[in-house]
Amino acid sequence: MRKPADKAQVDAELQRVVELRHPEPHAVLGIHPDGDGVVIRAFRPDAVAIHVLPESGGRVAMTHRPGGVYEARINGKDQTFNYLLEVEYPGKRVFTLRDPYSFLPTLGEMDLYYAGEGRHERLWERMGAHLLHHHGVRGTSFAVWAPTAAGVSVVGDFNGWDGRLHSMRRMGSSGIWELFVPEVGEGTRYKFEIRPGQGGPNVLKADPFAFRTEVPPATASVVHDLARYTWGDAAWLEQRAQRRDVHHQPWSVYEVHLGSWRRVVEDGDRPMTYRELAPALAEYIKFTGFTHIELLPVAEHPYGGSWGYQVGGYYAPTARFGHPDDLRFFIDHMHQEGIGVLVDWVPGHFPRDLHALGQFDGTALYEHADPRKGAQPDWGTLVFNFGRNEVRNFLIANALFWIEEYHIDGLRVDAVASMLYLDYSRKQGEWIPNRWGGRENEEAIHFLRELNETVHRKHPGVVVIAEESTAWPKVSAPVSEGGLGFDYKWNMGWMHDTLSYFSKDPIYRQYHHNQLTFGLLYAFSEQFMLPLSHDEVVHGKGSLYGRMPGDPWQKRANLRALFAWMWAHPGKKLVFMGGEFGQPAEWNHDKSLDWHLTHDPGHHGILQLVSDLNRIYRDMPALHDADGEPMGFQWLQPDSAAYNVFAFVRRARQPGRHVVCIANLSPTVRENYRVGFPFQGRYVELLNTDAEQYGGSNLGNMGQIHTEPTGWDGQPASATLTLPPLSVLWFTPG
């Protein structure tokens, strides 16, 4: 016979439960041995009466103790005794429920060990909220990391948001709190109420691992079952896994903000949903010929004006456009239409919103405590503590989550430079040097290398792309060679120089000729992607079309030339939506693109050009399969500054396959202009941006040329050409 529990001790422990200060409420609530029977305790301060309903039948009244605790002693039973609680509330409202404190933990020792080590690669399957059958009972298991909290409870629709009712238990020294709540189902809203261990008021936090959220500005997490969706993209995933060397593939990326690509004007100008976007966007991408789309961040974010770059819910797609399975449908549809999907991902910083990750358990948990490392001055955000195992695990598991649960084909990592440098956007005295006295963030470097190695090990064919704006070496080199391990790096230098050149009046371009040639000095130092991204059409910069000089005809001609120059240049391609048809207005995230312009002949001509560029680019290995290799590019005329003319050859790895590109970026027609060619014979015109179907003046070379055995530009053959104004020509042997 067990000795009955000491009443004073029980009272003291119950008081700690009431105050949300008990790390193990299961030790006093629920069912416990007591003498030759058991004692059952429940904390329901809002109840009028509670009865125990034994599984074998009967009804036992519980005694109401002070403070809202109910207790019943039942002789001749042990802890295997199964029961329900019948709870009566004011107004004779009666509910029968399972006691949440009668269940064993849902987390195992190995889960806790690997989470603490920072090596739990499927962390989202254990943390957060999970619908499951536990000991034969349907409900939801909740788990949250809050190591310094004095107490944690889960609150929501199921308990009237009363933080006293569902206190969680701390799982040893892991800092993880857990509770299984029976009968909580799909669609239930919830948060965690945390009592800081250092004192102060309780805080309400959204679940860092929530799979679904309310529609902002509401901030609650929502219980969601991720196991219901049936995918139809197995063929795409199989083909992707077999594509081991992504650098030899054509990559032409269309960057999209889902909330403003196209809006439903007849329904209050609302954004399209994920399911509405899927067929419309896929049809458009197939027409324009892009290989991939890249979505501005789709993870939940409290402020729409951040475009998704200040993430509040890393494991939940934004509810603005639908539910998680709706986004899965969107990606599934893209894959079935042969379109890859990349997603912008923000592991460098997060917002200060009170419901989010900042000061999560009353301390700097996900961020650094010292603002010299933990605050991002440019954006007013907080910086992740990459040196903490649990934080690093949270982020790397999140990357794997989007790949495995949403089948995305790649991550574009935002603001990598802000992660790599401790003094990024900080003045002297506002940052802390590393252990060697330098400004390199060793913890972030380790994190990025671990991220890239993990993604590539587990998911061959998936790419990780760095938005990195400095001269940091070996960003796209393998970790084994001392690199960071990314597949591609955005070429920000190329973007700045190219836009600067094309925005100048042609009369001045001869003095800035090197802005287009300089990039070839470092074009093969990394695996580059050439970005004309959303960042270049906001904050008063205007649109790509608007930055081009001249009258409307010249603006369109310049933009066509820019695109053809870009598609011929070494490096993969990325264009933000609206640029492909020359939208004059700067991008506004609250407005649809100006789709009516695609019916204007001039703007439709730009769109048709981009479609043809993508088609030729995909079909011609010379334009993509040696992007990162010096043998894939050769200058013919890098120094014709006085004429604003450039000429070069793009070569494939297979000998003999090549494309000659000639750009005349002046408004003057160049007649009888001689250019060297690798072969003597017939060359066909692959592209002429001045063609009539693109809105040009239709000058050119009648679709073909015949080179003669006159050496020129270091080549054995040459031809005299007509170079249309503000144009780019492509030729290939035919």
UniProtKB/Swiss-Prot annotation:
One function term, GO molecular function aspect: cation binding
What the entry lists under Pfam families is as follows: Alpha-amylase, Alpha-amylase_C, CBM_48, GlgB_N
Q: Which InterPro entries match?
A: A-amylase/branching_C, Branching_enzy, GlgB, GlgB_N, GlgB_N_E_set_prok, Glyco_hydro_13_cat_dom, Glyco_hydro_13_N, Glyco_hydro_b
Kindly list the biological process annotations in GO that this record carries. Answer: glycogen biosynthetic process
Question: Does the entry feature the keyword Zinc, yes or no?
Answer: no
Q: Which family does it belong to?
A: Belongs to the glycosyl hydrolase 13 family. GlgB subfamily.
Quaternary state and partners of this protein?
Answer: Monomer.
Role this protein plays: Catalyzes the formation of the alpha-1,6-glucosidic linkages in glycogen by scission of a 1,4-alpha-linked oligosaccharide from growing alpha-1,4-glucan chains and the subsequent attachment of the oligosaccharide to the alpha-1,6 position.
Q: What is the protein name stated in its UniProt record?
A: 1,4-alpha-glucan branching enzyme GlgB
